[in-house]
């Protein structure tokens, strides 16, 4: 996906392929299983992957918000995941690695299978705390300025945030 606007109002799997590349655009999807899924296709012999370099993506899924049977890489854009409330799935689910080297990630979901990015070139904040549906979640710097703000449409217990605006050695508060 290189640009444009995609709005998937209901589906089993929002976007699914052996390789999912998002280089721009505005994507909003609602899935009753996985939101974005890179699945194994033994016919191709290639490792499944999800690559995000730009764009604004919102994945609201009852299953895994982002699910790769291989790798995930994010170098730009904004990815907001409203993942499962069931502990059988996670907001982020990957088998090999999740390289976070740019962009902004907000991943909210259940705690049971919670994963955060595995390789980071920017700070990541992981919080495990119950938050009710309809709550506004804000991450603020030491000066009280919002760095990240979102409203969760469903209950969550795992909150994962990463952005280049997080500075190493700085203090942040979550409200």
Show where each model-derived region lies:
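A composition-driven surface/loop motif
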Residues: 1-175
